[in-house]
Amino acid sequence: MSDNNRSRHITEGVARAPNRAMYYALGYTEADFQNPMIGVANGHSTITPCNSGLQRLADAAIEAIRVSRANPQVFGTPTISDGMSMGTEGMKYSLVLREVIADCIETAAQGQWMDGVVVIGGCDKNMPGGMMALARMNVPGIYVYGGTIKPGHYKGKDLTIVSVFEAVGEYTMGRMDETDFKAIEQCAIPGSGSCGGMYTANTMSSAFEAMGMSLPHSSTMANEDQEKVASAAESARVLVEAVRRQLRPRDIITRASIENAVAVIMATGGSTNAVLHFLAIAHAAEVPWNIDDFERIRKRVPVICDLKPSGKYVATDLHRAGGIPQVMKILLNAGLLHGDCITITGKTVAETLANVPDAPPPGQDVIMPIERAFYPQGHLAILKGNLSPEGCVAKITGLKNPVITGPARVFDSEDDAMSAIMDRRIRDGDVVVIRYEGPKGGPGMREMLAPTSALVGQGLGETVGLITDGRFSGGTWGMVVGHVAPEAFVGGPIALIREGDSVTIDAHQLLLQLNISDEEMAARRKAWAQPKPRYVRGVLAKFGKLACTASRGAVTDAFEE
């Protein structure tokens, strides 16, 4: 099979003379048409620090493609900043962006018959959006993560974006003066790169490396370091070789490799968003995978990394301690990874990890051996019960109060809940319910970092529960339960909760329960009426119409299921 197996459809033959004429205008020569066309999906943007450092990575990839005797074809992908849109109407566009990016890359690469694609992304939804596109198309591809941000510093402490969100709660409670508040705001994010803890972007990049779709060590590099540029160039070279070998994403993205990815997510204490996104990636790759698979893996994989938001360290600390290869080697030796999975380099996981030490380096406590794991089981639990028969997601490790039964404080939007929190109307023992924020109801399934961080800042993070049909940021921690499905907008049980109802969150029993009789639940369901959609035009209306339930990834192309 030729290197230009796809692009020859628009570059070969008499009938394609007009097509070639367009390429000549771009500086191509006749000899170039014999070489593969490699797309570079460049997420560079000055909207957010997560993506502001991507251009030099794209430039390195472009040059490496040329040196590898292939033709780079550069196109842009959009982004928004989750950190900037958080707590506002703009956050409704965040999950929408995942689908838009997947559609953009698929449209450009398929429309132009590209032979391979290098995806370069930074902020949270760049990650699954790009991977979904590669999995859908099954065109040789590689993911180049833009890299993590370095931590900020103030008064001897490492800072991340979550430090600022939590400072809001502390400041409003009078626990922090204005000088410290402003200093944290100004020092938390010192440069370019994605948010520094094991939040969503770093979680997904680590998982992509574990799955074999990104190069070893690349997921924990800092954006500003030169090794990140070198890694982008090497990624492009590896991709061109994958095109020549016809090594495709679906050769790599399998049920076994997704199990590897989820095992690493559990071991590193990753984001709840990974559940939603890997349901979507598996759907795109046509890999059988469901929400219960996460619980199956959680029960056998311990947490061996001490990373923010619930731990002490950030991604650059993990990198210095050996990065994802070190985590994977520990899991592989414990029989918790599939060593025979192929990776984008053509090597298996076991071959890739052959020279990685069996034990983490001494003198650090970022990565622990299995026998000294921070928690014996993973942290991302799937809860079920009469409030979420399809399942929901909670971080359950490190909770001082793993069971809470309390009165429901019911809010039909994040904005109403945030107002109540800032007005100090939430008390110890309450269970905050934020509903009509699901994929269809929001629409867009906003992340609830602002209210959860405000609760933490007010000292209520361990004593107040929060459940929502929306999502949580990778920076969220505490007694919080998200992705409740079915969502309120389609008549899910969360829509039937009334102010003051007794609600139980039980991390031990993996239970989310509304403590009323079946008869009362049935009566409320009969009386419930679906509200009108909040949007009837534009991209949010389209997403609300097309998105499926969160328990299946909230994808917009699940028409046949």
Swiss-Prot record:
GO terms for biological process: isoleucine biosynthetic process; L-valine biosynthetic process. Its cofactor is [2Fe-2S] cluster; Mg(2+). The modification N6-carboxylysine is found at K125. Pathway: Amino-acid biosynthesis; L-isoleucine biosynthesis; L-isoleucine from 2-oxobutanoate: step 3/4; Amino-acid biosynthesis; L-valine biosynthesis; L-valine from pyruvate: step 3/4. GO terms for molecular function: 2 iron, 2 sulfur cluster binding; dihydroxy-acid dehydratase activity; magnesium ion binding. Mg(2+) binds at D82, D124, K125, E447. The keyword Metal-binding applies. [2Fe-2S] cluster binds at C50, C123, C195. Binds 1 [2Fe-2S] cluster per subunit. This cluster acts as a Lewis acid cofactor. SUPFAM superfamilies: IlvD/EDD N-terminal domain-like, LeuD/IlvD-like. InterPro entries: DHAD_IlvD/Edd, Dihydro-acid_dehy_C, DihydroxyA_deHydtase, DiOHA_6PGluconate_deHydtase_CS, ILV_EDD_C, ILV_EDD_N, IlvD/EDD_N. Pfam families: ILV_EDD_C, ILVD_EDD_N. It is an enzyme of class 4 (lyase). The active site is at S473 (proton acceptor). Homodimer. Belongs to the IlvD/Edd family. Functions in the biosynthesis of branched-chain amino acids. Catalyzes the dehydration of (2R,3R)-2,3-dihydroxy-3-methylpentanoate (2,3-dihydroxy-3-methylvalerate) into 2-oxo-3-methylpentanoate (2-oxo-3-methylvalerate) and of (2R)-2,3-dihydroxy-3-methylbutanoate (2,3-dihydroxyisovalerate) into 2-oxo-3-methylbutanoate (2-oxoisovalerate), the penultimate precursor to L-isoleucine and L-valine, respectively. This is Dihydroxy-acid dehydratase 2. The lineage of its organism: Bacteria, Pseudomonadati, Pseudomonadota, Betaproteobacteria, Burkholderiales.
